[in-house]
Amino acid sequence: MIDLSLNRRPARSARAERVSMLPQLAAKAQASGVETALRWHANETVSMTMRQGVLLANQRARSSGISARVFRNGAFGFAALPDDSADALDRALRRAAENAELAPRAGAQPLAPAAPGRGLFDYRRTDARKFTAAERVELFRTLDAAIAAKYPDLVTRDLNLTLFCSEKALATSGGAETFSAVPRVIFHVSLALEAKDGIVDLYDAMGGFGEIEDHLADVDSLLARIDALYDDLRRKAEGAFCEAGPQDVVLDSNVAGILAHEAVGHTCEADLVLAGSIAGDRLGQRVASEKITLGDFGGRGPDGRSSFAIHVDDEGTPCADTLLIEKGVLKTFMHNRDTAQRLGAAPAGNARAFAFSDEPLIRMRNTCILPGDDPLDDMIGAIEHGYYFRRATNGQADLTGEFMFGVNCGREIRNGKLGRALRDTTISGVAFDMLKSVTHVGPTLSWSPSGWCGKKQPITVGMGGPAIKCRVHVGGRS
């Protein structure tokens, strides 16, 4: 058996109670006589919103329950109940077995073998006093008052906080036994002011892996980030629109990370490959510049600094690192045990479920372009006429690899130097074409603090990368 217990911590009584469920889950899974995964799963979210000094929302939500997933004669059966009693566990297991009997069968092939993942991975703090609800409100009031006093020209100022923690105990008939609790903080500051031609806004996301004490305890640091955000907003209000058409650009790490996830990562998920993804018939082919190596990683990513952590997936498979593209060549896809068997690959721990009532799907974990050795100044200096895009907003990509994303912060590049700030624009293209155009890859890997993915179920992910120089289609004014 593989022992993945990388983060053992003294447990509080509630944690000990959840960890103590593992032997019961394991005993029932192993006594089932078929491939079985039993999971207790709880998600807790605290959210706060303040606008113009008025607290609009301050709430806590929690969902928890038990699920059973059975694989029998080539078909899965799944059942879930919002209860964690022994009786609920038996009922869920029985219903899952019944559902497996009723499911359509395309064949009776087995699941790909996988070593059982084991370990305790509780990342919640035990060494410091927690912020109380009242202290969180007071922090918001302090920040809002400071913003209002320093920047009276703002027409709106919004503060949004989300504290999220996913906690689960999982055991399988194959011997996997694992408990995890992974917290994350997302703090958004959005500012707007009036320019000559209308309202201009800009936001920044802070936080990441851990709890509020890890990210929001230093008010001076937060205010410094807000000062930088205001400076960017002021320049943007006086900024220029992009020229439309194909352009040489530098994508900062925030934009490169989203593209790695949305435009490339999804095309390499094996269920979408089977559905006709553009990546499906390109294994072993060059799909990117030799400077591009792109992977999906377990743990907290290759540098241990992602905003998300995962060591064992929801099928009980240990999370191994996967290089999807290596030096420009497409090497493999992301799998669960079912698609790994169908496509002759090894599962690496990509089966994930967002809530107790969700069945695991093939999902990304920590997806990023690995850093190179090209300084940012060299990228900018290599462009005569183009743009430096720093922050991406909403966007979309499809199975053909075509993408379009909004960009809300950037600068002109003229004769190898940064010029005017930019207004909102869009970038679009085909992912593999864009990656083939990459000529520079920066040396610094950074991660979005707020990565989420919405493939049927929302789920936390890590999205990262260095800055890259490439060519994309830019929206704007001719």
What kind of region is each of these model predictions?
Residues 1-478:
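N-terminal small-residue-enriched
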